[in-house]
């Protein structure tokens, strides 16, 4: 049970009885207060209603507080500040939730707000010009954990990777591999500026030389090299994702979309709707006047759907713009039945949000929607020095390098220790420490401690009676565990999987603090030889903790530890 949704529902029901039509007000808060002394749940409903009723929030709060006090779940109600209503729940409510956790086990927190709706989540989509470097890991983990969250709340998820295999960067890559092919045949080469000098291209050149000999030197057509190179590098990328525990259901090629005529089809669809025209764009503010000339262009009426400017569909040389390829790609997604889409992009793609939303609205007649989530950079440090990454320089840290250094689970967890749009620092020393400063260790240690208690507890105990759990520490841990369904729903709704990380740390801290009480007060220990009933109740609490931590770690595909290695 999501206790916060339950109280919210009771509030709406009460409002409907008090004033007809007021139940339509839904943008109010029902959540735990930051200060525990202010109760278990607070709401700002009085302040929201004050705008409609044209009364002081405190006056409304006084009326509502008396009504809320009649709820079966409520022990007492208080009014605070300008009109906040603080509610203290009856202790029986928390004991009941504890029983529910142990009944549902790791299914506690599983919801069905998605109603089996199909949703497409595109993430990683790294350019196929080299192995997956660690800079891509954040987006990969973000997308993968987000899809697990969406499945937990009832969505039918398709995980997709868009292969950017059309354009100048691929031509540059093919030329770079061609040089490595010549090198493998014994020729001396010189890698000119702008090409990819990475050592990872050497094996591809050697494989081409072994398979084709000198045959490809005499051909003007580079399709064989192109296809072999892209296939080889995509396998390298998949290998990196596999090491990180990330997989995709669908890989869509930009090159194949262009070959299939999807760009022309999607542009025609927009044109038939009157959304494509020939016109002139104003000079972009980011460009100097000498680098830009006004010209007649094929434009999409993006501003009709909330964008800042209309968008060019063709380049000066007559070829399609990258945005035109994006239109075709999302037209393809919609054609495959996806009306709900999420795409995770690097923070440098912030300018794409409005145009993507505009074209989705235009293509679907406002029936489809897309959520764009940006993930910021990760700063890596090695021996106190920044580790820089660049494919063209050939020096970059791969996913394999990091996973072999610190492990898959640590890498996945650390990538979500900050909100996705914030810069993240990854300290190779700290993430391997067995201390509170290492987030994944702190959570796993709570799980290990819990299992140690269960192993050491008497095998024969009476049936657990949760009503014996009354101390502040015990109740605080129960209340923290009870938040899990609300955390899951909020994290999924906002596409913010870092909330799971923060929550697991909160659970671990509450448990470690409670465990620590037993050091100074023997009566606070979980296992009491002279009190089997209280021991059984506390082990019941420990069991609930184990279920919630296991459920949370499953979002990361991390196996909870029972013993420290």
UniProtKB/Swiss-Prot annotation:
Per UniProt, the keywords (alphabetical) are:
Aminoacyl-tRNA synthetase, ATP-binding, Cytoplasm, Ligase, Nucleotide-binding, Protein biosynthesis
What Enzyme Commission number does this protein have? 6.1.1.19
**Biological-process GO terms, alphabetical:** arginyl-tRNA aminoacylation
Catalysed reactions, as listed in the record: tRNA(Arg) + L-arginine + ATP = L-arginyl-tRNA(Arg) + AMP + diphosphate
EC class of the enzyme, as a word = ligase
UniProt entry tagged with the keyword Nucleotide-binding: yes
Instruction: Using the UniProt record, give the first listed, main subcellular location.
Output: cytoplasm
> What CDD domains does the entry give?
ArgRS_core
NCBIfam families xrefs: argS
Record-stated family? Belongs to the class-I aminoacyl-tRNA synthetase family.
Quaternary structure, per UniProt, is:
Monomer.
For this entry, the protein name equals Arginine--tRNA ligase
Q: What does UniProt list as this organism's lineage?
A: Bacteria, Pseudomonadati, Pseudomonadota, Alphaproteobacteria, Rickettsiales
